[in-house]
């Protein structure tokens, strides 16, 4: 962070607490091999919430380990093999899972949501993907969630976003669950002061859960980025909290969605680009410094539909060690100012940065001004860093430092 503070406190030798609470981390796996919980521990976060988006590793029967690890891989892009080898998998129930986490001695406070995927699969097995639960099964799920909260979970998470798939292509358990199933679970979560995180829920489901006695709903929120959208979205969120409902949104603090470059993904199609993708980093760097190879890359990029990403929403993060998330010129504008094709600009900036340069497709929070207006709502809190997931794509672990600078 650059700039002078209005007040400086000498904290040498002191513990600075409390800090930021990061409520959307997906650090469930990483904590196994990185109990320091980097990089959020470097950005003032002192408490991390795991178990987001309906995905957790408990409860888990011994034969179901690969199922839960596989779903975490396909939804959150955390390698299954790293999950299987990085954790001891010596638990079945959620309380035992929390005991294991405590033994890891994480550097931050850790709070966990128990996930719908694990609970539903534990109760229903393979039927959990496609079938509705019986009344007895709904009650059994509620009892498991109640026990998890009594053993230390701070709430429950579910995911109704259909594109989130299991390894076999089916939407993850809970995606199509009846609203009554969630209400039954909310009946045991609310009275115990727990959170109900709803991902991808429609207005009717959210309303039904929020109106269950004691319910506190948490969900992901944002605005379109169009002029006035931030204020409008803030007002809508506040209106959702009328009539005694307790609904909190969480949103990105800056443009986020998909990062690409020589060190990560290369979303450009063509035979030469395929060759580049197959190389390791050193091989990629050597290849783009070959003039003939680069000419072939540019020629393929000039073809219609060579890149499906909206390039007018792609921004270069700069050549400095600290990424520039405030850049106002997108890749198309940069290429026009240099009288180049956008692929030539991409390759030139990549070479200038020795392959370290990254390009950010702002899928979410595309307009910082509107995002600031959105945060005028007292029912919205910053987050959605996804620090433990999509590491080569999003991983916005520095959001807390960023928001301090605004």
Predicted feature descriptions by range:
Residues 33-155, 191:
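Divalent-metal coordination cores built from histidine and acidic residues
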Residues 97-101, 107-109, 113-126, 131-135, ...:
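Active-site neighborhoods of metal-dependent hydrolases
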Residues 1-19:
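Histidine-rich, glycine-flanked metal-binding segment
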Residues 25, 45, 53, 251, ...:
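Active-site metal-binding loops of divalent metal-dependent hydrolases
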Residues 7, 19-21, 247, 383:
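Residue-level marker for buried hydrophobic side chains located in beta-strands
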Residues 15-37:
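Di-metal (Zn2+ and/or Mg2+/Mn2+) metal-binding site signature of metallo-dependent hydrolases
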Residues 26-29, 53-56, 223-225:
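Acidic, glycine-rich active-site loops and adjacent beta-strand->loop/helix elements
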Residues 45, 193-194, 215, 245:
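A short helix->loop->beta-strand "cap" motif at the edges of active sites that frequently abuts
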């Amino acid at each position: 962070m650059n700039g002078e503070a209005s007040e400086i406190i000498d904290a040498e030798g002191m513990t600075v607490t409390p800090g930021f609470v990061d409520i959307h981390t997906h650090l469930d796996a990483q904590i196994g091999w990185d109990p320091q919980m980097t990089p959020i521990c470097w950005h003032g976060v002192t408490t991390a919430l795991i178990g987001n988006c309906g995905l957790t590793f408990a409860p888990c029967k011994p034969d179901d380990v690969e199922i839960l690890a596989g779903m975490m891989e396909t939804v959150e892009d955390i390698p299954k093999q790293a999950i299987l080898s990085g954790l001891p998998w010596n638990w079945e129930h959620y309380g035992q899972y929390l005991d294991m986490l405590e033994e890891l001695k994480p550097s931050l406070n850790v709070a966990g949501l128990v996930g719908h995927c694990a609970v539903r699969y534990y109760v229903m097995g393979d039927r959990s993907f496609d079938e509705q639960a019986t009344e007895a099964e709904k009650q059994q799920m509620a009892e498991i969630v109640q026990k998890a909260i009594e053993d230390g979970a701070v709430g429950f998470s579910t995911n109704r976003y259909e594109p989130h798939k299991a390894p076999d292509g089916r939407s993850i358990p809970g995606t199509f669950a009846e609203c009554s199933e969630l209400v039954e679970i909310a009946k045991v979560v609310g009275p115990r002061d727990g959170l109900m995180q709803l991902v991808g829920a429609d207005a009717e489901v959210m309303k039904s859960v929020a109106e269950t006695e004691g319910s506190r709903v948490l969900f992901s929120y944002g605005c379109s980025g169009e002029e006035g959208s931030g204020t409008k979205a803030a007002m809508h969120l506040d209106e959702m909290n009328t009539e005694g409902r307790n609904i909190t949104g969480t949103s990105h603090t800056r443009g986020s969605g998909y990062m690409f470059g020589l060190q990560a993904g290369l979303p450009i199609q063509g035979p030469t680009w395929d060759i580049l993708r197959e190389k390791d980093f050193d091989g990629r760097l050597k290849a783009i410094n070959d003039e003939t190879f680069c000419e072939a890359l540019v020629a393929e990029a000039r073809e219609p539909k060579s890149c499906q990403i909206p390039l007018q929403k792609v921004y270069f993060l700069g050549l400095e060690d600290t990424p520039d998330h405030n850049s106002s010129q997108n890749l198309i504008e940069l290429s026009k100012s240099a009288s180049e094709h956008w692929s030539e600009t991409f390759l030139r900036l990549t070479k200038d940065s020795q392959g370290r340069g990254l390009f950010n497709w702002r899928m979410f929070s595309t307009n910082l001004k509107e995002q600031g207006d959105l945060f005028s709502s007292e029912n919205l809190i910053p987050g959605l860093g996804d620090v433990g997931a999509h590491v080569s794509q999003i991983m916005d672990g520095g959001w807390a430092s960023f928001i301090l600078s605004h």
